[in-house]
From Swiss-Prot:
Its EC number is 1.11.1.7. Disruption phenotype: Knockouts show increased susceptibility to infection with E.faecalis but not with P.aeruginosa, increased levels of H(2)O(2) upon infection and a slightly shorter life span. Fertile animals show a bagging phenotype due to embryos being retained in the body and an increase of clec-60 mRNA levels upon infection. 50% of knockouts also have a dumpy phenotype. RNAi-mediated knockdown of the protein also results in higher susceptibility to infection by E.faecalis but not in a decreased life span or morphological changes. This is Peroxidase skpo-1. Residues 22-56 form the ShKT domain. Involved in hypodermal immune response against some types of bacterial infection. Probably utilizes H(2)O(2) produced by the NADPH oxidase bli-3. May play a role in cuticule biosynthesis. It catalyses: 2 a phenolic donor + H2O2 = 2 a phenolic radical donor + 2 H2O. Exclusively expressed in hypodermis. SMART domains: ShKT.
Length: 655
């Protein structure tokens, strides 16, 4: 009898041990199983996600060592011995009974696609309708809305998606309210002529930082700006929305560059109401290009606490629902191969954070985990922007222009400036002709042309690490001239970005270069021969041949030609305007990461330790070494192991 009982007990214990040993070997197994990956990729999932796929059996071989639920070596620095307060402040906002994680809909919501279709039908863009922030006040006290409304509780649409770009100075149109500058008065040169004669050059002057800076700058641009424009005008069209650029007779490479004006906000551009343009993205730096700038898109990208993914080769990517595309919160995710890589990295970062929070705070529901993860990722993007990107872009003047942070100011206009979006931040001159693909030993293994990486995700699906390392090794191009890749060969040669940038500035009513010099307390130029910021006499002579007087000079042209200031990639005028914009995005954002109460003190300390290098280590395919400072030019000699790159410890979020 005793031996029988012993045998039964032994069998039970063996079953128990084996059932415990049947584990998921990856942190995202449950999420992938819910997405149908057990059926789509059965071989890989059965090997790595037995428990999630329900393929455990007593006949399964017993692993020699217990596999851990979550990766530990390279994920988050929770092994490091850092002390956190034993009792944390309440996460419930003041005046609320609980943490509200869902924003109740109080108005009809449209997707970006639906709104764009309406704009095309009406030939004008409707602005966002202000919600009643008091209805969801406990949600708004803790989390951002998807469309940016109620960031400013006194003015709910300030900085929200689908609201007007703002201005530093009143608009300038030929007729005072609608017609492009120089369209009727002819006081400025043909944009294509300016591009060919002045701005386009195959000569590349290296900047002091690497090409990741260009890439991250584009990432930030797509986070905070999306112009309501559609390219439906051909060169044969002459309607009120069309302003195509006809090349001068001497231009042998093309006859015309199609150009469609940005949709005006409905009711503007008419006598008595100056034409204004719509920003379809949230103004705040909030990672909206990952999550979407309105609720419908956001819901389509989300599964419970996670962001939806496609598993390709055992790796996570943004949904690959159509061949050759990736679906993200912004429709321009695959505009360039490097941009698609960053979309992939920050999607992986969200899902890594969400999985860790899910394991750490099992009492949190999916909405709480999603909102906290989104808040953390948005905070990380802000940290990289203000601690790494802006100082390298603007240089020594960044601290003076932005000033010290003194907390949230609801009176600051957070909206994106027309002068920024349609002028100073159009830094296509940073783009190089070609980029290398570099292996883990920092050896070049292949090279691709920039134009071949446009709307092409093949390199991303193969190895995003090689893309990043290639960007690290190549100096960013000084933006004072544009490579012929973007003036002569982009999109099959149909687009000249220099000419388009000039025309877009005129379309958006930007004033002259001298007007913005005065705004920035810089001496306006009275003669092209007396222009210290442009020391090249040949360049000044060419400008004089194109423009009649300095007061006619386009803001974009004058700003981009300025010699970079100390430690900067930009001249003084562009540095001023871009600095003012980032100051507004910081001071006018109630959820800016340093604003007291947005994060606890331990959480804030952890966020400040994150860097772009850390993000690349956490989210690469198998990133082994990086430069400690992501924007420093790196040939491998100073690269350090990813294990030495410190970053976020999520213990500060344990409840």
């Amino acid at each position: 009898m005793k031996s029988l009982l012993f045998s039964i007990l032994l069998i039970y214990l063996i079953q128990l041990v084996r059932s415990e040993e049947c584990t998921d070997k990856h942190i995202h197994c449950f999420f992938w199983s819910q997405e149908g990956e057990c059926e789509v990729n059965p071989r890989w999932m059965k090997k790595h996600c037995q428990k999630a796929c329900g393929t455990c059996s007593l006949t399964s071989p017993t692993p020699l060592t217990r596999q851990q639920d979550v990766p530990t070596a390279r994920t988050f620095d929770d092994q490091q011995d850092r002390q956190f307060l034993p009792s944390r402040p309440s996460s419930i906002p003041e005046g609320c009974n609980s943490v509200m994680t869902v924003e109740a809909e109080t108005r009809r919501i449209f997707s970006s696609g639906q709104l764009t279709a309406r704009f095309r039908q009406q030939m004008c863009a409707e602005e966002q309708v202000a919600p009643d922030c008091s209805i969801n006040q406990c949600f708004h006290k803790k989390y951002r809305s998807m469309d940016g409304t109620c960031n400013n509780l006194q003015n709910p649409v300030k900085g929200a998606a689908f609201t007007a770009f703002t201005r530093l100075m009143p608009a300038a149109y030929d007729d005072g309210f609608n017609t492009l500058v120089s369209a009727s008065r002819r006081n400025r040169p043909n944009p294509r002529e300016v591009s060919v004669f002045l701005l386009s050059s195959e000569r590349s002057l290296p900047g002091h930082v690497n090409s990741l800076l260009m890439l991250f700058g584009q990432f930030v641009s797509h986070d905070i700006t999306s112009n309501a424009a559609q390219n439906f005008c051909g060169c044969q069209n002459s309607g009120p929305m069309c302003a195509s650029i006809f090349a001068p007779p001497s231009d042998r490479s093309r006859r015309c560059i199609p150009f469609t004006r940005s949709f005006p906000i409905c009711g503007t551009g008419q006598f008595g109401r100056v034409r204004e343009q719509l920003n379809m993205n949230t103004a705040a730096i909030d990672a909206s290009l990952i999550y979407g700038s309105e609720a419908i898109t956001a819901r389509s990208l989300r599964f419970a606490a996670m962001l939806r993914t496609s598993m390709i080769g055992g790796r996570m990517f943004p949904p690959n629902t159509n061949p050759g595309s990736l679906t993200a919160g912004d429709g321009r995710a695959i505009l360039f191969v490097g941009l698609a890589a960053l979309h992939t990295s920050f999607l992986r970062l969200h899902n890594n954070v969400a999985a860790r929070l899910q394991n750490m705070n099992r009492h949190w529901n999916a909405d709480r985990i999603f909102q906290e993860s989104r808040k953390i990722v948005g905070g990380i993007v802000q940290v990289i922007t203000y601690q790494e990107f802006v100082p390298e872009l603007i240089g020594d003047a960044s601290k003076t222009i932005l000033g010290a942070y003194n907390g949230y100011n609801p009176n600051v206009e957070i909206g994106v400036l027309n002068e920024f979006a349609a002028g100073a931040y159009r830094l296509h001159g940073m783009i190089q002709e070609t980029y290398p693909l570099v292996n883990s030993q920092f050896q070049e293994v292949n090279r691709y042309r920039f134009i071949d990486g446009v709307n092409n995700i093949n390199h991303v699906l193969n190895n995003i690490d090689a893309i990043y390392r290639g960007m690290m090794t190549v100096p960013v191009r000084s933006p004072q001239r544009l490579t012929t890749s973007v003036t002569e060969r982009l999109f099959g040669g149909s687009v000249d970005m220099a000419a388009v940038n000039i025309q877009r500035g005129r379309d958006h009513g930007l004033r002259s270069y001298n007007d913005y010099r005065r705004f920035c307390n810089l001496r306006p130029i009275t003669s092209f021969n007396d222009w210290p910021e442009v020391p090249d006499e040949n360049v000044r002579q060419r400008i004089g041949q194109l423009y009649r007087t300095p007061d006619d000079l386009d803001f974009y042209v004058g700003g981009i030609l300025e010699q970079p200031a100390a430690g900067s990639l930009l001249g003084a005028t562009f540095a001023c305007v871009i600095g003012k914009q980032f100051e507004r995005l910081r001071d006018g954002d109630r959820f800016y990461y340093e604003n007291p109460g947005v994060f606890t003190s331990p959480q804030l300390a952890e966020l400040k330790r994150t860097t772009l290098s850390w993000v690349l280590c956490q989210t690469g395919d198998n990133m082994v070494r990086v430069g400690r400072r992501a924007f420093d030019i790196e040939n491998g000699s100073r690269a350090v192991p990813c294990s030495s790159i410190t970053g976020l410890n999520l213990e500060a979020w344990r409840e």
